[in-house]
Every structure is written in C-alpha cells, then in structure tokens.
Amino acid sequence: MLKRIPVTQLRLGMFVQSLCGSWLDHPFWKRGGFLLDSQADLQRLRESAVKEVWIDASKGLDLPEEAAVSAAAVLPVTMPAGPSPARVALEEEIRHAALLCSRAKAAVVSMFRDARMGQAIDTAHASDLVDEISASVLRHPNALLSLVRLKTSDEYTYMHSVAVCALMIALARQLELPDPLVREAGLAGLLHDIGKMAVPDPILNKPGKLTDPEFGLVRRHPQNGARMLLDCRQVSALVVDVCLHHHERIDGTGYPFGLAQEQISLLARMGAVCDVYDAITSDRPYKKGWNAAEAIRRMAEWNGHFDPQVFRAFVKAVGIYPVGALVRLESGRLGVVLEQHGRSLLTPRVKVFFSARSKVPIPQQVVDLGRAGQTDRIVGFEPAEAWNFRNLDEMWTGLAKSTGSYFDAGTGNP
C-alpha cells in the first residue's frame, strides 16, 4: 500500500517509493524506490528540502496506527477529490473524447515545439490537460483509450503522448493508487517522450532501419527528456523518473541504466507497459501497428520485459477484447467490440454485422454477451484486412474520418 507521509515520520526499515518535490531538492535523484536501511540516508533526507515522501508499506515497515492518523490529518491534498464525473454512454463520450483529442493534439504540438526551441515547458497547461483526460477516462474509460489508437503515422509523435497519458491514468485507477498519484501518472505519461524533441525529425520519421549512430541518438531521449524536465523545475521526481526509466525492463536488459526489479519505480514500470502497448498498436512510418488483441498476446510472451502484476492490471484496464476489435462468435457471426463488461473480460457488448459462414452482410445488431441466458460467445479474433472491411472504425465510433484524421485540429508539425 502506498502512503504519503512527512519525512519527520520516516524510520529505518521503510521502503521509500518516491520523493515529493523537484529532483533538485533531494540527494537521491539517481534512485528508484529503495529500502531505507541507513541512518546516514535517513539523516540526509531529513536535512534535505524534501518535506514528504511516498512509502510502500507492502515492501517495508508501515506507520504506527497513531502516526498514520496524524499523517492523514496534516498532509495537504495535492488534487481535490471532488465528486467523480457521472458515467455516460460510450457513444456520448466518444464524441467528447474526439474533441478532447483534437485539443490535446494541438496542445502537445505546441508544448513539443517549445521544448525543441529550448523554451520552458508549460506544465500548468499540461496539468490542465491531464485533468481533462482523467475526467474522460472516469466518465467512460473505453472511449478515449480506444479512440487514441486511431491516430495516423504522421500524428504518432504527439498523439502517442496523449495515449500514454490516458493509459497511465486508467492503469493507475486499476491499481487503486491514490488520486494524487493518478494525476502524477497521467502527467508522466504526457511528458515521458519529451526528450525526443532533441532528435531531428528525419530520424524520428525515417521509414527505413536506423543506422547505429541514429539509433544511439534516439536511445538518449530518456536522459535528454529528464534534463528538460529538471530545467523547468516545475514537475515532481515521479514525473522525471518515468521519463528517465520508461525503457528499463524488469530483467535488467533495458536502457539507459539497465535497472531491474525493485530498482525501477512503480510508475516507471507502469510507463514501460503503457508506452510499449501504444507503440506496437500504432501505425508508424516504418511499420503498421498490430491490433490491440495481438499486442496483448505478444506482450504476454515477452518474459522479463514487464512487471507481471502491473501487466495483469493493464490487461484488466484495456480488456482482453478491446473496443474496436473484430471478433468471430460461435454462431459464425462477425462483430466489432463496442464495450467492456465490468463483470467479465470475456463477455463484451458486440455489434454483429456479417456472416462468416455465408460471407454476406447481415442486419446490424448489438449483442450483449454478458446478458443472462446469452449462449453465443467469442471464439477468436479476425483480421479486418483479411475480410476487406472498410470503415470498421466508424461502426463503433460513430465518427466519420473525412480529413484523413480523427484528430485534425489544423495544426502543423513543429
């Protein structure tokens, strides 16, 4: 269990997950989470500018009960909880999410342009954007999480940041992290690739294989991004940590430092999953993306890449049959997944429209596979290209892509 406590209540044997405040304020900037087992480290923390830390009570000592009550009473609230937005129908939130994605794309283009020109990152604007994305995920998580997968290869650099932000928020809520940490996770997702602005566009968008020097330049984006975020002095250690460590792997084979297991913070482990999932489900200049179902299957096979507990929570957040996936039912009908069921990952709502046996269209019908008495079930995924289905995305989004993009906000590249 994660708890935020004053440094005055730290004691030896506690596991410090992260430190609150700027990385410039504390002497542990190269570390992820660590067990506080040194009196010297404890003294350095108490003498630093850090006022509060996150501890993980499942990995070390917890607060005494009376101290926990005291901490809850005195700690400031980073983000007011307030009433949760009312959950709305998928169709309604899709329309809202499409507009939000357009605004988010424009905001990220502007933010990345500023970073490329050496200007300060507008973290206040970024935080407001995170709040909007978080509210959309709360109203209906399937809407925004599914819609951001429809970005074009030209939009990837910017919409990838929006997608990872939304995925981090959904995953943080699935892990039942406290609201302040959910917000930090979202901001970390939005800014995790800011260091790519130090990489020239011809390399970022190169359709062929990168040369060794080009690949080396791309691999430096975590350090470049961390420096940018440190320079702006307005983001927490958690956000910088994700930027610096989202390419680390749980088995120690990642980069830039080859960290492993508990050396990698929880949010960085989350960032690794969300970053890879969106990357492999997106069309890139050099590779067409996998469908969401194939991506989940492949990621499950990559032993040593991801924290297993975090990955299981991620699958629960996005679903085994993600919205927009083409599936075959036992009845021989083909349909597109419309919505996940909270009760079971195996019984989504599906819009059927085609007979695989007769190979002809059938009247469209929404089938709730989780309804009592429903005997039909999903038997597998189908590749849409194999059936030459066009406008499949319009079937579940209800949106028409008339300009080549669902998120055309009239913006150009920085």
UniProtKB/Swiss-Prot annotation:
InterPro entries xrefs: DUF3391, HD/PDEase_dom, HD_GYP_dom, HDIG_dom
Activity modulation: Activated by Mg(2+) and Mn(2+).
UniProt-listed Enzyme Commission number(s): 3.1.4.-
GO biological process, one term: positive regulation of cell motility
Biophysicochemical property: temperature dependence: Optimum temperature is 30 degrees Celsius.
Binding site residues for a divalent metal cation 2: D193, H221, H246, H247
Superkingdom: Bacteria
Role according to the record: Phosphodiesterase (PDE) that catalyzes the hydrolysis of cyclic diguanylate (c-di-GMP) to GMP. Hydrolyzes c-di-GMP to GMP in a two-step reaction, via the linear intermediate 5'-phosphoguanylyl(3'->5')guanosine (pGpG). In vitro, can use pGpG as an alternative substrate and hydrolyze it into GMP. Acts in regulation of motility, synthesis of virulence determinants and biofilm architecture.
Keyword DNA-binding recorded: no
PANTHER family in UniProt: CYCLIC DI-GMP PHOSPHODIESTERASE PA4108, CYCLIC DI-GMP PHOSPHODIESTERASE PA4108-RELATED
Enzyme superclass (EC): hydrolase
The protein, known as: Cyclic di-GMP phosphodiesterase PA4108
Sequence positions that bind a divalent metal cation 1: H160, H192, D193
Catalytic activity of the protein: 3',3'-c-di-GMP + 2 H2O = 2 GMP + 2 H(+)
pH dependence: Optimum pH is 8.
UniProtKB keywords: c-di-GMP, Hydrolase, Metal-binding
One term of GO molecular function: cyclic-guanylate-specific phosphodiesterase activity
Source organism of this protein record: Pseudomonas aeruginosa (strain ATCC 15692 / DSM 22644 / CIP 104116 / JCM 14847 / LMG 12228 / 1C / PRS 101 / PAO1)
